Amino acid sequence: MKFRALGLVLLLAVETCKAEEITCEETKPFTCNQTDRFNRKHFDDDFIFEGGKGRGLNVWDGFTHRYPEKGGPDLGNGDSTCGSYEHWQKDIDVMTELGVDGYRFSLAWSRIAPRESNQAGVKYYNDLIDGLLAKNITPFVTLFHWDLPQVLQDEYEGFLNHEIIDDFKDYANLCFKIFGDRVKKWITINQLYTVPTRGYAMGTDAPEPYIVAHNQLLAHAKVVHLYRKKYKPKQRGQIGVVMITRWFVPYDSTQANIDATERNKEFFLGWFMEPLTKGKYPDIMRKLVGRRLPKFNKKEAKLVKGSYDFLGINYYQTQYVYAIPANPPNRLTVLNDSLSAFSYENKDGPIGPWFNADSYYHPRGILNVLEHFKTKYGNPLVYITENGELLILSGCNVKGYFAWCLGDNYELWPSRSFHVSPFYLLHRKDKGAFPSFEA
């Protein structure tokens, strides 16, 4: 079976911006002084690979300045990273040299809005999009990669509040209107699972979890409905959403751990895929979570069901799963409501070679994920939107592949400052940039 190929690069706009002269206060809610503001010959021809000025503050600015210890051992933040805002033309030159023909990046909500359009931000993205298209590089544009404008967090607690749905729709409407004549691949939200769990359950990310996830799904669906009704007939683009995925295998062959593994698939993958394909949450989640899990009314269920033209799949790891008691020492949360826990090792050793921190390589897992989506969710059109190595499972509807990432960035996770790029741009600081030997 032949597949097609496109690019190599992904770089988050939110992570390449420099916040200007931020001053922050120890208040609740948090406030700041600027709140207002590979080888392609085996692939078909149309397969896709991807290998600030005027910006207001977002929740990551506030979070990392108020709690610098959560920025990793180097107390890092995103004030200055690999500088794509200033060096986007050089980035495009590098992509061209590498033969990339797809680039996935995110729009920084706080650079464009939230209350009125920011012309400096709009010009930057217009220039970037035009520059990509001039080099025959297809832009894949994400509307939200966790960088909520701080003003919306301060006003009504962001995704905890239903009001976010219409604000997100208004922001998306502005983006479709300004950029949609040239952008034909839109992603609403990156990794639906991440903000509810890491932001509202673990506390490692800038801010519940079930309410936040529910509002994310509704915000996503409303934006998709807007695009399909108002813009798609003329602009002829596609719109989807990105799922962070993992694969799960039983810790051992006991029935309890096999059952725990299946439950966990529903809590991790089904939590979002069941609403997107059936308009409801998985039955096992309804049973175990109970009243803490919101419900879609009939109108909402119809809106959410089928609200994607394609899915982005991010994959990095596979974990062993084992059962835990129904009444564990620590109270149940979104992270263990499935009555399961995770490990990278079982009695036979690690699940794969060590990568970094507590992560291990397990490339086979992405094949398992793709097969799962093929058999359980109707074989949707898929772009692998973050991954480090290309692996395709025959029969799965995979259209493109994006390696993470173009430049080493400020990683939104503890131990933030490590190299993640198979080809990386060295931290510039006016020194220019050049590819590493990995390219």
Curated annotation (Swiss-Prot):
Q: What is its EC number?
A: 3.2.1.147
Q: Which domain of life is it from?
A: Eukaryota
Tissue specificity, in the record's words, reads: Expressed specifically in stamens and petals.
Q: Which InterPro entries match?
A: Glyco_hydro_1, Glycoside_hydrolase_SF
Give the signal peptide as a residue range, or say none if absent.
1-19
Q: Which residues are glycosylated?
A: N33, N336
Q: What top-tier enzyme class does this entry carry?
A: hydrolase
The record, for Gene3D superfamilies, names:
Glycosidases (3.20.20.80)
An MF annotation (GO) of this entry: thioglucosidase activity
Q: Would the keyword Kinase be found if you checked this record's keyword annotation? A: no
Any one Pfam family here would be: Glyco_hydro_1
**Keyword set includes Glycoprotein:** yes
Q: List the disulfide bonds.
A: none
Catalytic center residues: E386 (nucleophile)
Residues annotated as binding a beta-D-glucoside? H145, N190, Q191, Y316, E386, W404
Keyword line: Glycoprotein, Glycosidase, Hydrolase, Signal
What reaction gets catalysed by this protein? Answer: a thioglucoside + H2O = a sugar + a thiol
The Gene Ontology biological process terms listed for this entry are: carbohydrate metabolic process
- Please report which protein family the annotation says this sequence is part of: Belongs to the glycosyl hydrolase 1 family.
Q: What is this protein called?
A: Putative myrosinase 3
Question: What organism does this protein naturally occur in?
Answer: Arabidopsis thaliana
